């Protein structure tokens, strides 16, 4: 699912065109689930094909039980007994270490093969039976995933599809991955329990406060311009990860958080109701406005839940103009035509769109499987268009969506703002400080991105506090969240992950010649002496014939030389004789 933001021009000349093209949407507390998908990749002639053959969702409570994945197959043709092999569940050494890229776990017939089974008495087979069965109702297949909670599914699991159990090579590769997606249709938001919402806000602010000192130190102007710290994408990523974890989005490990270089780092999330606690602008100092902040747009909805003012009444479910100038409470802002401010002047909003919003980092969440597919397309610019036709991608889930799904930005945050009298001053200050830190990041990234977009060397120096520790994917800077839920900055680890991503979606390589099969390879110590003996027996007659011909030739030449030797007349008398 691709997250969308609303970018509106600042000029007032084309207001109808702005909102005709992109209408902001309401946030209805969307639900997110872990979704499994199976993709089949095969070749016909010189053309490669890739198609998502089936999906299955875990329960809203998480992937706690075995999952049944229904799917179809396109590459097996009329074969009735296909076989699936995975490398991860092999127990034999030879099955795990021989011909991994070619056979994908089944170089021998004694390897762990998931042969198709018959339907069980209850209609489908349980995990105790064969996990790979045929669905007689739909004509497709069912694969039972016994451990959907395992991190390997988020990384992506690659398997081989064999037409039969005696096939030498797979006819296609199967990729199964688990991603975090928004559930459609989004259910209606429910009333939030006030004590729970207050507790959630307190937990969130405590995390923000613990990291605030370091962030403020990084963002505060130094005493000397020569000692100014460069902007760090890593700071933005860590801030977003902390907010996400504090908001209750769990299982964020073995994944990537990415920031787009050409997109603002902050996004304004519309709130469903007006701010309840308001004061006159004279009673509070007016904070500096923050321009060019996009408004988050939920693609599943067409209207905003609440607006203070709007040029078109159809854009909002409910509109209520303020009776006086207001000041937003801690953690909240007024969004008017891409500009954030803490105060709202009731006399100047009649011709503009103004909504109450919260502020979160604009990041994208990828699983390893998703990023591997995207990396394989970007590895060669010549093949991006061709591969994109056969490899549709679920790009990821916006961090703004994740926070909204957890209650922030809708019921929980709104109710907490309305109940600020029950919160301590320290909690209120922490929320406000967090928003100010993100606002400072917004101002820095706007100036930095303009220079970095034209100078990759400068960009490399600005990606992290201690060097280039982000993975560049097109125009996105991605950081890896390891198994501990922390941003990994180890360069060696990142390089290893980058190589794995480049190799993960490599096309199915042609199999080796028959004489290089693993079975034949094990017989080579016995076959080599036999082959040498056969070779000697084949060459011996030729060699003997050659040697015999050479001996005969040498004998003939020697005999002829003796016959043709020059004749010399023998003397008839003694030369020393004198008569």
Swiss-Prot record:
**What GO terms fall under cellular component here?**
plasma membrane
Motif location (CKS-17)?
A: 453-469
Family matches, as SUPFAM superfamilies: Virus ectodomain
Where exactly is the site Ancestral cleavage site? 387-388
> What happens to this protein after translation, modification-wise?
Specific enzymatic cleavages in vivo yield the mature SU and TM proteins.
Q: Where is this region: Surface protein?
A: 23-387
Regions of this protein lying in the Extracellular compartment: 23-523
Report the glycosylation sites.
135, 203, 242, 251, 276, 312, 337, 482
Q: Which CDD domains match?
A: HTLV-1-like_HR1-HR2
One Pfam match: TLV_coat
Q: Which cysteines are joined by disulfide bonds?
A: 470-477
Query: Where is it mostly found?
Result: membrane
Query: Cell membrane: present as a keyword of the record?
Result: yes
Q: Does the keyword Protease apply?
A: no
**Leader sequence segment:** 1-22
According to the record, the segments passing through the membrane are: 524-544
In this entry, the parts of the chain located on the Cytoplasmic side of the membrane are: 545-579
Stretch list, region Transmembrane protein: 388-579
**Intracellular or extracellular location(s):** Cell membrane
Q: Where is this motif: CX6CC?
A: 470-478
Membrane-topology annotation of the record: Single-pass membrane protein
Misc. remarks from the entry: This envelope protein is encoded by a baboon specific provirus. It has no ortholog in human.
Q: What does the UniProt function comment say about this protein? A: Retroviral envelope proteins mediate receptor recognition and membrane fusion during early infection. Endogenous envelope proteins may have kept, lost or modified their original function during evolution.
Q: Which family does it belong to?
A: Belongs to the gamma type-C retroviral envelope protein family. HERV class-I F(c)1 env subfamily.
Domain notes for this protein = The CKS-17 immunosuppressive domain is present in many retroviral envelope proteins. As a synthetic peptide, it inhibits immune function in vitro and in vivo.
Q: What is this protein called?
A: ERV-BabFcenv provirus ancestral Env polyprotein
């Amino acid at each position: 699912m691709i997250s969308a933001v609303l970018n509106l021009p600042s000029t007032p000349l084309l207001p109808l065109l702005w909102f005709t093209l992109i209408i902001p949407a309401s946030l209805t507390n969307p639900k997110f689930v872990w979704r499994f998908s199976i993709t089949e990749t095969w070749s016909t002639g010189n053309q490669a094909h890739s198609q998502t053959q089936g999906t299955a969702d875990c329960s809203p409570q998480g992937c706690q039980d075995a999952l049944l994945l229904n799917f179809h197959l396109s590459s097996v043709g009329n074969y009735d007994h296909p076989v699936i092999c995975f490398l991860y569940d092999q127990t034999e050494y030879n099955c795990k270490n021989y011909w991994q890229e070619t056979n994908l776990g089944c170089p021998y017939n004694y390897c762990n093969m998931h042969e198709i089974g018959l339907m069980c008495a209850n209609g489908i087979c349980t995990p105790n039976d064969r996990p790979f069965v045929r669905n007689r109702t739909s004509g497709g297949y069912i694969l039972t995933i016994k451990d959907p909670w395992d991190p390997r599914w988020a990384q992506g699991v690659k398997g081989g599809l064999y037409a039969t159990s005696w096939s030498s090579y797979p006819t296609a590769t199967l990729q199964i991955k688990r991603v975090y997606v928004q559930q459609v249709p989004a259910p209606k938001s429910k009333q939030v329990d006030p004590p729970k919402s207050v507790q959630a806000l307190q937990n969130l602010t405590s995390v923000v406060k613990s990291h605030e000192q370091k962030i403020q130190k990084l963002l505060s102007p130094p005493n000397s311009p020569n000692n100014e710290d460069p902007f760090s994408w890593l700071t933005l990523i860590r801030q977003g990860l902390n907010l996400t974890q504090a908001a209750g989005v769990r299982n964020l490990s073995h994944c990537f958080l990415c920031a787009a270089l050409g997109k603002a780092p902050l996004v304004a999330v519309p709130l469903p109701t007006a701010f309840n606690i308001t004061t006159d602008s004279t009673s509070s100092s007016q904070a500096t406005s923050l321009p060019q902040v996009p408004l988050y747009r939920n693609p599943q909805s067409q209207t905003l839940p609440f607006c203070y003012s709007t040029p078109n009444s159809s854009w909002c479910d409910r509109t209520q103009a303020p009776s006086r100038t207001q000041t937003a409470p801690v953690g909240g802002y007024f969004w008017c035509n891409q500009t954030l401010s803490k105060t709202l002047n009731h006399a100047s909003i009649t011709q503009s769109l103004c909504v109450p919003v919260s502020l979160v980092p604009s990041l994208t969440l990828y699983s390893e499987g998703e990023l591997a597919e995207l990396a394989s397309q970007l590895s060669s610019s010549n093949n991006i268009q061709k591969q994109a036709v056969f490899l549709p991608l679920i790009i990821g889930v916006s961090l703004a969506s994740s926070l909204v799904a957890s209650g922030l930005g809708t019921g929980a945050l709104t109710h907490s703002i309305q109940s600020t009298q029950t919160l301590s001053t320290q909690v209120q200050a922490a929320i406000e400080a967090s928003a100010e830190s993100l606002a400072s990041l917004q101002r820095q990234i706007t100036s930095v991105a303009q220079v970095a977009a034209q100078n990759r060397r400068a960009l490399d120096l600005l990606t992290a506090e201690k060097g280039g520790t982000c993975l560049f994917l097109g125009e996105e800077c991605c950081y890896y969240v390891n198994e501990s839920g922390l941003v990994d900055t180890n360069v060696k680890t990142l390089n290893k992950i980058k190589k794995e991503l480049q190799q993960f979606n490599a096309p199915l390589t042609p199999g080796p010649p028959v004489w290089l099969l693993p079975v034949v390879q094990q017989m080579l110590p016995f076959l080599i002496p036999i082959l040498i003996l056969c070779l000697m027996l084949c060459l011996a007659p030729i060699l003997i014939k050659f040697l015999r011909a050479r001996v005969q030739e040498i004998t003939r030449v020697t005999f002829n030389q003796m016959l043709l030797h020059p004749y010399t007349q023998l003397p008839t008398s003694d030369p020393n004789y004198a008569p």
